[in-house]
Amino acid sequence: MANRSRERILKKRDSTPAIQHRNSSAELQNIVKRNRASEKGGAYAVCCAHPIVIDAAIHQAIEDDSMLLVESTSSQVNQLGGYTGQTPAQFAHFVHSAARRIGLSRDRILLGGDHLGPFPWRDEASSRALKKAFGLVRACVLAGYGKIHLDASMACADDAKVVPENIVAQRAATLCAAAEDAFKSLPEGAAAPLYVIGTEVPIPGGELGAGETPVTTTVEGLNQTLRIFKQAFEQRGLSAAWQRVVGVVVQPGVEFGNDFVIEFDPARARSLSAALPRTPALVYEAHSTDYQSPHALAQMVKGHFAILKVGPWLTFAFREAVFALSAIEREMLAAKKRGKLSRVREALDQAMRRKPIYWRSYYHGDEGQLRFARAYSYSDRCRYYWHEPAVQAEIERLRSNLKTSSFPLTLVSQYLPQEYDAIRAGQIEQTAEAIIRHRIQLVLRVYAAACGIRAQPDLFQMPPN
């Protein structure tokens, strides 16, 4: 009997490595309270599963002595693996392992699930898709995710083209019930999940077309959403969970497409900023904030759009650094007339052409235009292909070439002037890894500055208020 009890205890311990500690959840709640009271302070969410981006985000959190909020979407990570091949438990282990290796305390990390709902299974009947969505939410909570975006807004195979908001709210409430049920099985001391609601969300990874303008959420629409969702939660006995709703997704009038960015205009969102509800004590969560200027992001936080999501901009920065290092490699090895060049750009494009599912509906034009878009668009659809073995092999060849033959600072100045300055100032090492990480951190610093976590960012200069 004693041995069985010990086995149960050990099993319980082994099953709790990713349980969310109170510190980061409480910190997000404090950020929300502060922003509501003073229009100051915000949080940015790193919505990316790329290992090098995660590493850069961890380094940035250490540099800023801040919380790190990392979110995975239902398509990236789910109980069936998602396109990254990771379950929520595996993703949590991956993030926590990276943090431990680099030196960030686990209680500084808050994991979030973005667009948790039936989206990955939208081609199935709603009953089947929702059943899988329940499994996804449960898996996230059991893996220690502390921030859950309940998104049941997408139509399934047997739904009308646009799902009525009351149905969306009812489905979101059932997802919440699944999360609450999973939470009950966590060990004592685990922080209760925090929730984000809202139906005015872009398709995960989706953007507007050229010439389209996002419609800013109206105050009437916001109040209707809150009323319908509150009723749906209460009907399922989720009043306590309703008080843990820290964010509602709204459209503040920002978006980006393949070759354009729609900048935040505080005047267009002024009425929404003034309509922050008294209860629950939430702020607005803004999606598709990538490529906004530092000033625009700071103005968003001031207007209570205090949870800023960023994803494609981070892998865009990664791609910029890799392509620039490839150019340095070509110049360097051509001058030395030896060594085999890497073919990162070619391998990436070949991978995209072999499996066009992630970009075909986003890019249009002749083959030349498509090739350009596959590499250089703001929508950054190439982010879905960096993990391909052939692409990884070429990146490794690039890193090996740059490590074997020291690359001249003059070439860094030519292709990566900001990293050149950082190397000259002794801020980073003259290695491919340090350069790539620095490029990503430049973007993260823009968000950290907008959220009041650090001083002015390095990437741009903010105009005065």
Model-flagged regions — what are they?
Residues 68-87, 150-165, 257-258:
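Glycine-rich, proline-tolerant flexible connector loops at the mouths of alpha/beta enzymes
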Residues 86-107, 111-113, 165-189, 266-280:
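Alpha-helix-loop-beta-strand connector modules within alpha/beta enzyme cores
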Residues 273-458:
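Flexible, acidic glycine-rich loops studded with aromatic residues
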Residues 40-51, 117-131, 213-216, 283-287:
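Active-site mouth loops of central-metabolism enzymes
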Residues 42-47, 68-71, 109-114, 146-150, ...:
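Hydrophobic faces of well-ordered beta-strands that scaffold small-molecule active sites
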Residues 48-53, 83-94, 122-139, 169-171:
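Glycine-rich anion/phosphate-binding loops
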Residues 57, 114, 151, 300:
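Conserved, mostly hydrophobic/aromatic
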Residues 9-43:
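N-terminal amphipathic alpha-helix/helix-capping segment at the start of soluble metabolic enzymes
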